[in-house]
């Protein structure tokens, strides 16, 4: 059944069958994110909202660490399944699951050990320290659960088990939504309560994911007895996983940089940007879901050397993703004030947040090009292209644009920097993709 999906099913249908569950899980996660932001803002404490916004990049960092073995492992497994090397795929799966657990425990220990220094780097000051520290502590304690969850959620999709991958995300998000108000208000935990609910949701999701791999999968395993992988295979995983991780690390870096630039204009600007970025995630993560949801399809057909089907997959992916990005941009720009008002009904927050949201949205269509291109690089094992794109949009290109635009246009320059970075990165992605397709054509001739 899974082979039919990857090899014979019509491209739009196969792509959507794999991508829609990912998108739906993203939407559920977004609903949680919005509810989380709503409950935090409902406290009415501007310093609390700003404190959580300053520490929010840490959650993205956890996902980045999880991507090392989550996306790196799933890329390797997809290609192995396409090459009909099921036993090698099983070994790779077991290795990635156990190493991600150990890695997560190490990260938790490091984050707790260097808490004071890291909070300082995040830009936490005396006004926000109480709330930021409370939120950070629980996120650090639960880092292992967040990092580990990225592994099984990604590898399940390589076997076509996208629904099971989605279910874990939904279960975790529902737990978050239920316990958010209980911890924040019922137990009077405030910022710490929001983090506690997040960690609890991830723990429950992890339990489900392990069950799904053990009971639903036919070609994957959690058994430590299958952990025998070669150094070459580990290198293959890391060559894709590290660039994939850098993508999210750069997002964390971007958020920290932006917050630090905005701090000079007041905590109200940081609070407004925190809300705007959360809302911006609605479109961004849906686009991410559609881009990376089809990644197993790309990897499988690349491994199977089915050039014709691979080209059809990419054509559909680019056209669909870019059209969706443009639609989201139009809708978000029109309704920006009303959306921001839902979270915090303060005139200055609404005005600043709406402007920030619009500037963030301008580059969505261009971001779509970068997303699909990054997905392809990871799926086909092109570590060089994946690395370049991972350090561009919210890394090297963004930093250069941010410094130039902020010096020339001040506050407005800070806000428009991401959109400018999106355009430049899309051009870089186009060049990389042309080289990949040319190489693929020459290889198959």
Where are the predicted features?
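Short alpha-helical transmembrane segments in multi-pass integral membrane proteins
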Residues: 1-19, 77-144, 186-242, 298-363, ...
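Hydrophobic transmembrane alpha-helices of multi-pass small-molecule transporters
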Residues: 61-64, 176-181, 206-210, 282-285, ...
């Amino acid at each position: 059944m899974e082979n039919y999906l990857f090899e014979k099913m019509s491209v739009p249908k196969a792509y959507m069958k794999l991508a829609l569950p990912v998108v739906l899980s993203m939407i559920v996660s977004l609903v949680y994110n919005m509810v989380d932001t709503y409950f935090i803002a409902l406290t009415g404490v501007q310093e609390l909202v700003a404190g959580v916004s300053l520490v929010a990049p840490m959650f993205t960092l956890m996902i980045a660490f999880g991507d090392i073995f989550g996306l790196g492992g799933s890329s390797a497994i997809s290609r192995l399944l396409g090459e009909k090397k099921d036993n090698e795929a099983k070994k790779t799966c077991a290795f990635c699951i156990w190493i991600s657990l150990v890695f997560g425990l190490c990260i938790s220990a490091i984050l707790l050990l260097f808490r004071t220094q890291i909070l300082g780097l995040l830009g936490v000051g005396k006004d926000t320290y109480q709330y930021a520290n409370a939120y950070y502590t629980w996120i650090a304690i639960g880092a292992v659960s967040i990092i580990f969850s990225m592994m099984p959620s990604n590898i399940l999709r390589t076997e076509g088990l996208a629904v099971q991958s989605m279910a874990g995300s939904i279960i975790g998000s529902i737990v978050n939504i239920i316990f958010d108000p209980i911890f924040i208000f019922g137990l009077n935990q405030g910022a710490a309560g929001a983090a506690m609910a997040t960690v609890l949701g991830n723990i429950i999701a992890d339990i489900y994911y392990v069950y799904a791999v053990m009971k639903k999968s036919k070609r994957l395993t959690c058994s430590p007895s299958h952990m025998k992988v070669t150094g070459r295979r580990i290198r293959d995983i890391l060559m894709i996983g590290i660039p994939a991780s850098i993508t999210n690390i750069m997002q964390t870096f971007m958020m920290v940089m932006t917050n630090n630039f905005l701090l000079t204009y007041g905590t109200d600007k940081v609070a407004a940007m925190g809300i705007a970025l959360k809302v911006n995630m609605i479109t961004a993560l849906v686009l991410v879901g559609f881009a990376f949801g089809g990644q197993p399809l790309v990897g499988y057909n690349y491994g199977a050397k089915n050039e014709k089907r691979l080209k059809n997959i990419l054509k559909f992916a680019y056209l669909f993703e870019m059209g969706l990005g443009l639609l989201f941009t139009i809708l978000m720009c029109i309704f920006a004030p009303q959306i921001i008002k839902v979270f915090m009904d303060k005139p200055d927050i609404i005005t600043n947040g709406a402007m920030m949201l619009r500037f963030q949205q301008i580059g969505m269509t261009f971001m779509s090009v970068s997303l699909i291109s990054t997905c392809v690089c990871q799926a086909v094992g092109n570590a060089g292209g994946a690395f370049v794109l991972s350090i561009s949009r919210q890394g090297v290109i963004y930093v250069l644009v941010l410094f130039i635009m902020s010096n020339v246009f001040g506050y407005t320059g800070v806000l428009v920097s991401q959109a400018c970075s999106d355009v430049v990165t899309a051009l870089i992605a186009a060049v990389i993709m042309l080289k990949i397709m040319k190489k693929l054509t020459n290889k198959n001739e």
